[in-house]
């Protein structure tokens, strides 16, 4: 333990005092030299992640002004990086889903292409590029052509306001970022309707109508579930929401467990993922709204679906899991700011990947709901739950403010960056958040106690037994 605290240039001196032999000294000197070389290489690699120090100097040498670099060149570089990384993320999300499903079913999954099947997404992409781009004879060609691009664009535009990390790890810090996410992501509904209608297929049209009804229904619950967290953040900026959680040193999922569950369920239904994948029910609608699509256009819908899953996971990470914030990571900023940004990026990716794993886990665990159950969950359960959560959150904040200063009790520290509370205020808020889950469940059970969609007892009572007709059968079989 004493050796771990020694600087590199004092390690040989430490062993010489301890009476180390010559061969051991030589091995030690070579090890120290290797460590120094590794540290120099690491420091040089860190320069690659210092855009202000290195890349800005290179760009200034090209003759561009500082304003052109800041407002034109840098956004293009960030957009290119985000699109490339998200596309790779989406490609390997399919690989992870196949591996997870194989693990649950005691199989190996993709193993043929590359080591452990790691090149399988690349092989799938090449296969789709070589497939025939088939367009139905009576389809509306232009709408049929543009629908997949609308779906992909609506998913990828959202990443422009997602804070993957501090400083240069976010493309645009918009003061209405969360509202922009909800507005742009809802455009994806238009792509599915256009794809179903332009295909001139009854199965595609029914799939498009189902998806539009489902997504519009669950968008309401998704938006309402975020209001409770916004009451604590006091801003619509995505970076501001992360800063509010960092300044209060706590994630909003602790205050809003019900809001997080509501948002996650609504997001899964919004993405048409199992158990809410009614628009793509194979037994009823073949492949839903993309039944008539093939080749690369079909893969664009596939990419849009997985990109939308990443969007929901990233928004849940930002609003409820602290985004790139993690305890004690901010101390790296004073040591090496570039390392701090990289570690923050990794923290964000790990949190988002955990939520994506929940997506895959639920798909291979739960059966598909009936359509009436699907709509009832959205309108009779999630929307009332979100409204109850808003009322309870408002009551909790009112109680915290009312108790502040009462009989020497201090519950609020500051309101500069969100609602920053003392340990007493945090304890009260956590208790109300946990209690709110049970209050919401009790109220929903009371509201829907006569509903027969999920009540097996009522369904059994409504079953009418058919009396067996009297007499002999028309055709008698002789034994």
Enumerate the predicted regions with their spans.
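Short, low-complexity, charge-dense intrinsically disordered segments
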Residues: 4-10, 17-43
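Short linear motifs in intrinsically disordered/low-complexity regions
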Residues: 10, 15, 30, 54-58, ...
């Amino acid at each position: 333990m004493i050796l771990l605290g020694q600087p590199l240039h004092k390690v040989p001196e430490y062993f010489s005092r301890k009476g180390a032999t010559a061969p051991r000294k030589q091995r030690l000197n070579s090890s120290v030299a290797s460590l120094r070389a590794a540290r120099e290489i690491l420091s040089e690699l860190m320069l690659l992640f210092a855009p202000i120090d290195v890349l800005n100097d290179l760009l200034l040498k090209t003759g561009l002004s500082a304003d052109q670099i800041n407002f034109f060149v840098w956004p293009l570089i960030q957009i290119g990086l985000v699109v490339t990384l998200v596309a790779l993320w989406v490609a390997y999300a399919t690989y992870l889903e196949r591996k997870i499903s194989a693990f649950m079913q005691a199989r190996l999954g993709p193993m043929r292409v590359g080591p452990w099947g790691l090149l399988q997404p690349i092989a799938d992409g090449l296969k789709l590029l070589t497939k025939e781009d088939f367009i139905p004879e009576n389809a509306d060609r232009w709408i049929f052509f543009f629908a997949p691009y609308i779906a992909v664009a609506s998913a990828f535009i959202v990443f422009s306001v997602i804070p993957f990390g501090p400083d240069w790890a976010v493309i645009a810090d918009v003061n209405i970022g969360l509202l922009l996410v909800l507005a742009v992501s809802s455009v994806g509904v238009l792509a599915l309707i256009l794809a179903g209608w332009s295909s001139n297929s009854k199965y595609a049209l029914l799939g498009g109508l189902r998806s539009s009804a489902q997504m519009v229904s669950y968008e309401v619950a998704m938006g309402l579930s975020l209001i409770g967290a916004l009451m604590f953040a006091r801003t619509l900026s995505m970076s501001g929401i992360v800063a509010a959680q960092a300044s209060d040193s706590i994630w909003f999922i602790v205050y809003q467990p019900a809001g997080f569950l509501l948002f996650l369920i609504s997001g899964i239904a919004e993405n048409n993922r199992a158990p809410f994948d009614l628009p793509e029910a194979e037994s009823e609608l073949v492949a839903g709204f993309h039944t008539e699509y093939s080749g690369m256009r079909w893969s664009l819908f596939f990419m849009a679906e997985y990109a939308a899953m990443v969007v929901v996971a990233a928004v849940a990470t930002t609003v409820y899991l602290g985004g790139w914030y993690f305890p004690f990571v901010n101390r790296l900023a004073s040591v090496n700011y570039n390392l701090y940004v990289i570690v923050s990026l990794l923290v964000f990716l790990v949190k988002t990947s955990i939520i994506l794993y929940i997506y895959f886990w639920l798909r291979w665990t739960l059966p598909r709901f009936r359509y009436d159950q699907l709509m009832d969950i959205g309108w009779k359960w999630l929307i009332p739950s979100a409204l109850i959560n808003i009322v309870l959150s408002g009551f909790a904040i009112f109680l915290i403010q009312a108790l502040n200063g009462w009989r020497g009790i201090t519950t609020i520290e500051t309101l500069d960056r969100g609602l920053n509370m003392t340990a007493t205020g945090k304890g009260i808020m956590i208790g109300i958040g946990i209690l709110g889950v049970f209050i919401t469940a009790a109220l929903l059970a009371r509201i829907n106690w006569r509903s027969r969609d999920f009540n097996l007892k009522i369904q059994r009572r409504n079953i009418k037994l058919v009396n067996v007709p009297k007499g002999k059968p028309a055709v008698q079989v002789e034994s």
